[in-house]
Amino acid sequence: MWALSKASNPTVLRLHTSLELTQATIETCPPSTPRHPLDRLLEIPGIRSIDLHRYGARLNLLPGSDPHAITREVCELLVKEWGGASSKRADPARTFAVPYRGSRLVAESLQMAGSQPILRELFGVPGVVEAILEPGHVWVRLGRLFSWTEVEEDVRRTLGAPGYPETIKP
Protein backbone atom coordinates (compact mmCIF):
# COMPACT_ATOMS: atom_id res chain seq x y z
CA MET A 1 0.00 0.00 0.00
CA TRP A 2 1.04 3.57 -0.56
CA ALA A 3 -0.32 7.10 -0.28
CA LEU A 4 1.01 10.53 -1.16
CA SER A 5 0.31 13.68 0.83
CA LYS A 6 1.32 17.33 0.80
CA ALA A 7 3.41 18.75 3.60
CA SER A 8 3.08 22.26 5.02
CA ASN A 9 6.34 23.03 3.19
CA PRO A 10 5.40 23.46 -0.51
CA THR A 11 8.75 21.97 -1.61
CA VAL A 12 8.02 18.63 0.09
CA LEU A 13 5.74 15.71 -0.75
CA ARG A 14 5.28 12.84 1.71
CA LEU A 15 5.09 9.25 0.55
CA HIS A 16 3.58 6.75 3.00
CA THR A 17 4.08 3.01 2.50
CA SER A 18 3.34 -0.28 4.20
CA LEU A 19 6.81 -1.47 3.14
CA GLU A 20 9.81 -0.87 5.36
CA LEU A 21 12.09 1.43 3.35
CA THR A 22 15.06 1.70 5.72
CA GLN A 23 16.19 0.73 9.20
CA ALA A 24 18.08 4.00 9.59
CA THR A 25 16.45 7.02 11.19
CA ILE A 26 16.83 8.92 7.89
CA GLU A 27 18.57 7.69 4.75
CA THR A 28 19.14 10.42 2.18
CA CYS A 29 19.12 9.61 -1.53
CA PRO A 30 21.45 10.58 -3.06
CA PRO A 31 24.07 9.60 -1.91
CA SER A 32 22.21 6.36 -1.08
CA THR A 33 20.07 4.71 -3.74
CA PRO A 34 16.51 3.75 -2.82
CA ARG A 35 15.22 0.36 -3.90
CA HIS A 36 12.96 -0.03 -6.91
CA PRO A 37 10.60 1.67 -7.74
CA LEU A 38 11.62 4.62 -5.56
CA ASP A 39 14.91 4.85 -7.44
CA ARG A 40 12.88 5.93 -10.48
CA LEU A 41 11.40 8.87 -8.56
CA LEU A 42 14.83 10.54 -8.64
CA GLU A 43 14.50 10.64 -12.46
CA ILE A 44 11.41 12.87 -12.24
CA PRO A 45 12.39 16.47 -13.06
CA GLY A 46 11.93 18.64 -9.99
CA ILE A 47 12.73 16.01 -7.35
CA ARG A 48 16.01 17.06 -5.72
CA SER A 49 16.38 14.22 -3.20
CA ILE A 50 14.48 11.64 -1.18
CA ASP A 51 14.76 11.13 2.58
CA LEU A 52 13.77 7.56 3.45
CA HIS A 53 12.18 6.82 6.82
CA ARG A 54 10.98 3.46 8.14
CA TYR A 55 7.57 3.47 6.39
CA GLY A 56 7.71 6.63 4.39
CA ALA A 57 9.74 9.04 2.35
CA ARG A 58 10.08 12.77 2.10
CA LEU A 59 10.35 13.87 -1.53
CA ASN A 60 12.35 17.11 -1.55
CA LEU A 61 11.50 19.26 -4.55
CA LEU A 62 13.69 21.81 -6.28
CA PRO A 63 12.75 25.45 -5.62
CA GLY A 64 10.44 26.73 -8.36
CA SER A 65 9.33 23.24 -9.41
CA ASP A 66 5.66 22.44 -10.02
CA PRO A 67 4.46 20.26 -7.11
CA HIS A 68 1.19 19.43 -8.90
CA ALA A 69 2.98 18.13 -12.01
CA ILE A 70 5.44 16.19 -9.84
CA THR A 71 2.57 14.70 -7.82
CA ARG A 72 0.95 13.49 -11.05
CA GLU A 73 4.19 11.89 -12.26
CA VAL A 74 4.88 10.24 -8.90
CA CYS A 75 1.34 8.85 -8.76
CA GLU A 76 1.50 7.54 -12.34
CA LEU A 77 4.77 5.74 -11.63
CA LEU A 78 3.62 4.24 -8.33
CA VAL A 79 0.22 3.14 -9.69
CA LYS A 80 2.06 1.13 -12.36
CA GLU A 81 4.38 -0.44 -9.77
CA TRP A 82 2.23 -0.81 -6.65
CA GLY A 83 -1.38 -0.34 -7.78
CA GLY A 84 -3.79 2.36 -6.65
CA ALA A 85 -3.11 4.70 -3.75
CA SER A 86 -4.67 4.10 -0.35
CA SER A 87 -7.06 6.62 1.17
CA LYS A 88 -6.40 5.37 4.72
CA ARG A 89 -5.78 8.03 7.36
CA ALA A 90 -3.36 7.70 10.25
CA ASP A 91 -4.56 6.21 13.54
CA PRO A 92 -3.70 8.38 16.55
CA ALA A 93 -0.79 7.40 18.79
CA ARG A 94 -1.60 5.27 21.83
CA THR A 95 -0.11 5.14 25.29
CA PHE A 96 0.85 1.94 27.08
CA ALA A 97 1.84 1.64 30.72
CA VAL A 98 5.39 0.38 31.28
CA PRO A 99 7.60 0.00 34.35
CA TYR A 100 10.07 2.71 33.32
CA ARG A 101 11.44 5.38 35.64
CA GLY A 102 14.16 7.10 33.60
CA SER A 103 14.25 10.32 31.61
CA ARG A 104 12.16 10.95 28.49
CA LEU A 105 13.52 9.15 25.41
CA VAL A 106 12.29 9.56 21.83
CA ALA A 107 13.04 7.10 19.02
CA GLU A 108 12.04 7.06 15.36
CA SER A 109 14.14 4.00 14.50
CA LEU A 110 15.92 1.02 15.99
CA GLN A 111 19.10 3.07 15.63
CA MET A 112 17.66 5.87 17.80
CA ALA A 113 16.37 3.32 20.33
CA GLY A 114 19.99 2.61 21.19
CA SER A 115 20.33 0.11 24.01
CA GLN A 116 16.98 0.93 25.67
CA PRO A 117 15.19 -2.48 25.75
CA ILE A 118 11.57 -1.24 25.64
CA LEU A 119 12.24 0.98 22.62
CA ARG A 120 14.31 -1.72 20.88
CA GLU A 121 11.49 -4.25 21.28
CA LEU A 122 8.88 -1.82 19.94
CA PHE A 123 10.90 -1.28 16.76
CA GLY A 124 10.70 -5.03 16.20
CA VAL A 125 6.94 -4.57 15.67
CA PRO A 126 5.97 -3.89 12.03
CA GLY A 127 4.23 -0.53 11.65
CA VAL A 128 5.82 1.33 14.59
CA VAL A 129 7.40 4.61 13.43
CA GLU A 130 7.87 6.45 16.72
CA ALA A 131 8.00 5.63 20.41
CA ILE A 132 8.29 8.15 23.24
CA LEU A 133 9.25 6.62 26.55
CA GLU A 134 8.46 8.56 29.73
CA PRO A 135 8.25 7.50 33.37
CA GLY A 136 5.38 5.00 33.62
CA HIS A 137 4.32 4.91 29.97
CA VAL A 138 5.31 4.82 26.31
CA TRP A 139 3.56 6.62 23.44
CA VAL A 140 3.54 4.56 20.25
CA ARG A 141 2.81 6.03 16.82
CA LEU A 142 2.17 3.92 13.72
CA GLY A 143 2.88 4.63 10.09
CA ARG A 144 -0.10 6.13 8.28
CA LEU A 145 -0.98 2.91 6.47
CA PHE A 146 -1.05 0.75 9.60
CA SER A 147 -3.96 0.43 12.02
CA TRP A 148 -4.18 -0.46 15.68
CA THR A 149 -6.50 -3.29 14.66
CA GLU A 150 -3.50 -4.89 12.90
CA VAL A 151 -0.71 -3.90 15.29
CA GLU A 152 -2.07 -3.57 18.84
CA GLU A 153 -1.81 -7.28 19.67
CA ASP A 154 1.87 -7.31 18.64
CA VAL A 155 2.60 -4.18 20.68
CA ARG A 156 0.84 -5.67 23.71
CA ARG A 157 2.74 -8.93 23.26
CA THR A 158 6.01 -7.00 23.02
CA LEU A 159 5.22 -5.09 26.20
CA GLY A 160 3.51 -8.12 27.73
CA ALA A 161 6.44 -9.48 29.66
CA PRO A 162 5.52 -10.09 33.30
CA GLY A 163 5.00 -6.81 35.08
CA TYR A 164 3.71 -4.78 32.14
CA PRO A 165 0.26 -3.31 32.91
CA GLU A 166 -2.52 -2.81 30.40
CA THR A 167 -3.01 0.11 28.04
CA ILE A 168 -3.59 3.56 29.49
CA LYS A 169 -6.59 5.17 27.82
CA PRO A 170 -5.64 8.46 26.06
Indicate residue ranges for each PLM-predicted region.
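Short glycine-/aliphatic-rich beta-strand segments at the starts of folded cytosolic domains
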Residues: 5-28, 90-110
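N-proximal, solvent-exposed amphipathic alpha-helical segments enriched in charged/polar residues
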Residues: 29-36, 108-124
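Compact, charge-rich alpha-helical regulatory domains located at protein termini
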Residues: 9, 24-34, 45, 126-127, ...
